[in-house]
């Protein structure tokens, strides 16, 4: 039992270690916001990132609905696309599944300003906004960062990112040819720029999870449960 879990007053009274009793709040508002723009349609291990994001979103929706929270789905590329209403209760999972099936591939650049501003205008209470997205560098992500700063003033924002294993491999591989050196340097630069954006997101108050694609759903569920237990929602 960790120290944070110990109820010291009750333990002293009863002469043994007793755990604190936590009341996990229900009725939180959870928004699953899926970027379906061009970058998210690139494959990771043979499957488009947006498909992996939808799978992770559905897993978290199932857990959140079962836990008594409200869940809604929102997707966007150059403009807002899918927008479900908020639902509650396990039987509503079918509706979330149906709306998730409408999330489609796009060759358009993502317009974060329009998408996140539209989403924020629809939220009439503090929410956990989970954004599944990707970005390349600080310049392309600049408009996203400006909008996120406004969103975090009222809401808890969590970014879900998939690790770019291909870039990491290119950056780490021992070069055998001159062109390998150029590829390695470029990959390393892109990874560093990505970390700059992640760092700025955190400075703005957003939470960020960068996970392997097969761990995206489980990592999200773990963080969601942690946030609930810490009464941060």
Give, region by region, the residue ranges found by the protein language model:
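Von Willebrand factor type A / integrin I
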Residues: 121, 125, 139, 143-233
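An amphipathic, basic-hydrophobic helix/alpha-beta surface used to engage anionic
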Residues: 1-91, 126-133, 139, 146-150, ...
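Short, electropositive alpha-helical surface patch
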Residues: 84-98, 216-219
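Hydrophobic alpha-helical scaffolding
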Residues: 50, 86, 105-109, 137, ...
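Short, basic, glycine/proline-bearing loop/turn elements
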Residues: 5, 100-104, 130-133, 182-183
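A glycine-rich phosphate-binding loop feature that marks nucleotide/adenosyl-phosphate handling sites
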Residues: 76-79, 117, 217
């Amino acid at each position: 039992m960790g120290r944070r879990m110990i109820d010291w007053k009750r333990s002293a009274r009863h002469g043994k270690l007793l755990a604190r009793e936590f009341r996990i709040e229900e009725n939180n508002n959870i928004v699953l916001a899926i970027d379906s723009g061009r970058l998210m349609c690139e494959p990771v291990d043979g499957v488009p990132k947006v498909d992996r994001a939808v799978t992770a979103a559905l897993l978290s929706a199932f857990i959140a609905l079962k836990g008594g929270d409200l869940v809604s789905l929102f997707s966007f590329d150059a403009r807002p696309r899918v927008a479900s209403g908020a639902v509650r209760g396990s039987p509503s999972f079918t509706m979330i599944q149906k709306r998730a099936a409408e999330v489609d591939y796009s060759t358009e650049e993502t317009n974060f300003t329009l998408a996140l501003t539209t989403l924020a205008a629809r939220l009439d209470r503090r929410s956990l906004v989970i954004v599944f997205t990707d970005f390349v560098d600080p310049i392309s992500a600049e408009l996203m960062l400006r909008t996120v700063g406004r969103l975090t003033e009222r809401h808890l924002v969590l970014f879900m990112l998939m690790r770019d294993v291909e870039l990491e491999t290119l950056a780490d591989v021992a070069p055998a040819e001159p062109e390998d050196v150029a590829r390695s340097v470029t990959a390393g630069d892109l990874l560093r720029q990505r970390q700059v954006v992640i760092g700025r997101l955190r400075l703005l108050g957003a939470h960020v999870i960068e996970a392997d694609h097969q761990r995206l759903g489980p990592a999200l569920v773990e963080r969601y449960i942690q946030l609930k237990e810490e009464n941060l929602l």
